[in-house]
Amino acid sequence: MRRILVTGALGQIGAELTPALRARYGAAHVIASDLAEARPGDDLYERLDCTQAEAVADLISRRDIDVVYHLAALLSAVAEDRPQDAWSVNMSGLYNVLEAARRFGCQVFFPSSIAAFGPSTPRRGTPQITIQRPTTIYGVTKVAGELLCDYYATRFGVDARGLRLPGLVSSVAPPGGGTTDYAVEMFRAAVRRKRYCCFLAAETRLDMMYMPDATRAIMDLMEADPERLRYRNAYNVTGMSVTPREIAAEISGHAPSFAADYRSDPLRQAIADSWPQSLDASAAREDWGFAPRFDLAAMTRDMLARLNAATGPFDDSISHGVPNANAGFG
């Protein structure tokens, strides 16, 4: 049985991928790591700063790791505020993981993003192979990361694989500084019976994906026959092409008194306007059977059910369309 390390395990993807990996491969075979200190007695978690090369190599060697899911990164909006930190975390961390993988013979997963594209890229049906000229430091690190993974694959034989993920919607992880976090915030506001003020314009269309589809795609790619993978690294995957207004309308079908306002933040709006509205995922479908299960309606039902289970049922005033006197901005 493979021995797995997840870096950035407490982040947006890691919070759901780590338990999914443990369900598939057994908890004892999956080591989680992040910057937070380990809790006493937790043998399946270790503190790790991925910018420290010796620490990365030591953990991989000591735990006899076969596969690294390298998720540690600063997300788009945070990265724009801290570009030097973003380069250090996103690039040095990946380099250290790839170097350790070269030394110890590990397989590596690296999550790329729609941020790897820019305003000169075709925005609808963005092809697998196309121009990549991002305008954010986050996007620059994703393109550079794709190329670095390709280099380690061709030069050193490291089995590095990756996906270009759309904006991700998670019922588990709180918003973490991403440009598409508005969707998560919107669902959470609805469950809390709050009016929501969206930081993107109402008609900003972007490719999005529900996290259960993303974690399944990640695991399926890593199990795929390498002989069938034309690209290995940075496959386009897609979930749904939606706008904030469309998500709000779908939520309102379940919570009639939910309402959203739209006051675009210049920084995040500019980032969103440079990203694809939809991705062409035909290569992923053909090479390893990528098939998302959640459209907007299914995602909305599942998100609200999960968030309600965590926080309590909807208020009757929402369920029956009666305005909530305590509504405010989320």
Enumerate the language-model features and the residues they cover:
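N-terminal Rossmann NAD(P)H-binding glycine-rich loop of SDR-like oxidoreductase domains
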Residues: 4-23
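Glycine/proline-rich active-site loop of Rossmann-fold NAD(P)-dependent oxidoreductases
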Residues: 143, 156, 169-184, 211-212, ...
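Conserved Rossmann-fold NAD(P)-dependent oxidoreductase catalytic core, especially the SDR/UDP-sugar
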Residues: 95-137
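NAD(P)-cofactor binding segment of oxidoreductase domains
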Residues: 62, 81-108
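Conserved beta-loop-beta element that borders a ligand/cofactor-binding pocket
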Residues: 113, 147-172
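A conserved pocket-lining segment of Rossmann-fold NAD(P)-dependent short-chain dehydrogenase/reductase
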Residues: 80, 131, 165-175, 185-209, ...
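C-terminal substrate-binding subdomain of Rossmann-fold SDR/epimerase-dehydratase oxidoreductases
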Residues: 199-201, 207-321, 325-329
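NAD(P)H-binding glycine-rich loop region in Rossmannoid oxidoreductase-like domains
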Residues: 50-89
